[in-house]
Swiss-Prot record:
PANTHER family linked to this entry: FERREDOXIN-2, MITOCHONDRIAL, FERREDOXIN/ADRENODOXIN
Domain of life of the source: Bacteria
Entry keywords, A to Z: 2Fe-2S, Electron transport, Iron, Iron-sulfur, Metal-binding, Transport
Gene name tied to this protein: fdx
Role description: Ferredoxin are iron-sulfur proteins that transfer electrons in a wide variety of metabolic reactions. Although the function of this ferredoxin is unknown it is probable that it has a role as a cellular electron transfer protein. Involved in the in vivo assembly of the Fe-S clusters in a wide variety of iron-sulfur proteins.
Name the record gives this protein: 2Fe-2S ferredoxin
Gene source species: Escherichia coli (strain K12)
Domain 2Fe-2S ferredoxin-type: 2-104
Residues the record lists as binding [2Fe-2S] cluster: 42, 48, 51, 87
GO molecular function, a single term: electron transfer activity
Length: 111
């Protein structure tokens, strides 16, 4: 079973976490199943960027992003080359290290 290391996040996971994921499962579903409440305002339909994450290790093992995901990522706060929407990125058999950005578009508008 592949593992996902979630780097520490002040609000969602202050100490970080190591999760077991199922091959084919999205990063978001694995996180939610393990009690890490990543925001997903569009209910996992690839219509927002609130579940934006940065895959620090294992990025190349993920299936390619769709054009729709790429279009949404263009709107993400803090976009990096290793950015993915966690509701779309499906785990393979390789371990991942994932960073959840401090802010999302929703948070940026609230503050």
């Amino acid at each position: 079973m592949p593992k996902i290391v979630i780097l520490p996040h002040q609000d969602l996971c202050p100490d970080g976490a190591v999760l077991e994921a199922n091959s084919g499962e999205t990063i978001l579903d694995a996180a939610l199943r393990n009690g890490i409440e990543i925001e997903h305002a569009c209910e996992k339909s690839c219509a927002c960027t609130t579940c934006h994450c940065i895959v620090r290790e294992g990025f190349d093992s993920l299936p390619e992003s769709s054009e729709q995901e790429d279009d949404m990522l263009d709107k993400a706060w803090g976009l990096e080359p290793e950015s993915r929407l966690s509701c779309q990125a499906r785990v393979t058999d390789e371990d991942l290290v994932v960073e959840i950005p401090r802010y999302t578009i929703n948070h940026a508008r609230e503050h």
